Amino acid sequence: MSNILILDFGSQYTNVLAKKIRLLSVFCEVLPWNTPLEKILQKSPSGLIFSGGPHSVYQNNSPEVDKEIYNSNIPILGVCYGMQLIARDFGSEVQGGKSEFGYTPIVFYPSELFKGLADQDAFHTEIRMSHCDCVVVPPKDFFVIASSQHCPIAAIECPKKKLFGLQFHPEVSDSQDIGDKILSNFVKHICQTSETWKIETIEKQLIQGIREKVGETERVLLGLSGGVDSSVLAVLLHNALGDRLSCVFVDTGLLRKNEVEEVKQQFSSLGLEILVVDASEKFFHDLSGIEDPEQKRKVIGAAFIEVFDEASKNLDVQWLAQGTIYSDVIESAKSCDATQVIKSHHNVGGLPEKLNLKLLEPLRFLFKDEVRALGKVLGLPDVLISRHPFPGPGLGVRVLGEVRREYVEIVKNADSIFIEELKKANLYHKVSQAFAVFLPCKSVAVKGDCRHYGYTIALRAVESTDFMTACWPSLSREFLNRCSSRIINEIPEVCRVVYDISDKPPATIEWE
């Protein structure tokens, strides 16, 4: 099967790049930059990409690759730091102080990499630059194929070795049309890949992989959340294992309004029997007094495991299945030691060392949009597939600070009002995710001519294609006013509503 490997040097866009390549129907995997050459070659990659990163190639102990990789006859594309690394490894000098940020005029020259952009003549356009270092002179046998005013060597190629370098990021949305064309040229034409990464193929591979891993007699326990990921996984596992799957839905007390009944009805219609366990007392007890977001996630993850472990004693199961997806792994920073931890995912960072069940994560290398596409192939109803993402820790990370029952009830009702109004205004499917956040601080208000102290609710909505980056939508004043009025009037404890206008980055989508 055709495949592209990305060696990750710590760029915040590495996984966006991987998703872009998969959209070309070619499998792409992200590996740490220091992956041994032998392991890389064992995967028989059709092409390699060196990602960007926060380092400078002239610094001591900067990340580098085994130089034998250049003799492998595998096409290589270096992006930003990756280009500078290739240039340095072939004898060129890289210097700092030549920074460019934002939209920059650039000229593309004829190259196989720019097929369809600069076939005969130079192509003038603008591209988004974000770099502090520049290649001073092209290495021997390399040609300059793009230039900007402050970066004369903005792209390079060595046709003989099929080595290419870009000083800019083709994967960022600002450069989408041009960037997509460049990536397509590299992946499809230079690497000569075939379109083998398709949802129908993925479904068959996942089912086969599940059966091989679990064997013919062992059983699997799945913790349902009611979200897209666990719902898709439930049907996938049922198709693979039949009645050897046991589904447990844990009522943590941290779920959305009416979620327990909705989940029972949805899965009953899919022919899946589920066991509902009310563990809300345990979760609130374990979270008592804990304010740190990271600690809350770990406590919630540990509590899930304890509940599942107890349930498994009566179900004769050997495996615990989780709906971990690629973005969960990414945000927990397990793909590259040059990346800093943003937040632990409860499925990833919160697992205790001693796990009495073997872990099964079939969706671990799928992005959210791929999970949704898989759900359609599996026949899940749109109401499940198109539902907004909900964090594994639930409302536990939408109550800032200590999690208390009364706080959860407040944010649960506020969230329900917000979602209801979005659906009424036909906005629910126009935003990628929306929810309410409880702020445990009181402010002064006036209700019924009396002085009143009440809590604050923050409303959060984002638009995103991959949830690695996101922007806030400009919801109308009239719409926000309706939401605010209902929340303040229908929830006595609330006296103030604010709307979050923070993009990701720098903010994350969830507040905790």
UniProtKB/Swiss-Prot annotation:
Residues the record lists as binding ATP: 225-231
Start and end residues of each Glutamine amidotransferase type-1 domain: 3-196
- Please provide, alphabetically and separated by semicolons, the GO molecular function terms listed in this UniProt record: ATP binding; GMP synthase activity
- Keywords, A to Z? ATP-binding, Glutamine amidotransferase, GMP biosynthesis, Ligase, Nucleotide-binding, Purine biosynthesis
Q: Give every GMPS ATP-PPase domain span.
A: 197-387
Catalytic activity, as annotated: XMP + L-glutamine + ATP + H2O = GMP + L-glutamate + AMP + diphosphate + 2 H(+)
Catalytic site positions: 80 (nucleophile), 169, 171
Q: Which GO terms describe its cellular component?
A: cytosol
Q: In which pathway does it act?
A: Purine metabolism; GMP biosynthesis; GMP from XMP (L-Gln route): step 1/1
**E.C. numbers:** 6.3.5.2
Please provide an example of a Pfam family that matches this protein in its UniProt record.
Answer: GATase
Q: Which PANTHER family match?
A: GMP SYNTHASE [GLUTAMINE-HYDROLYZING], GMP SYNTHASE-RELATED
State the protein's purpose: Catalyzes the synthesis of GMP from XMP.
Q: How does it assemble?
A: Homodimer.
> What name appears for this protein in its UniProt entry?
GMP synthase [glutamine-hydrolyzing]
Supply the source organism for this entry: Chlamydia muridarum (strain MoPn / Nigg)
User: Highest lineage ranks of the organism?
Assistant: Bacteria, Pseudomonadati, Chlamydiota, Chlamydiia, Chlamydiales
The gene is guaA
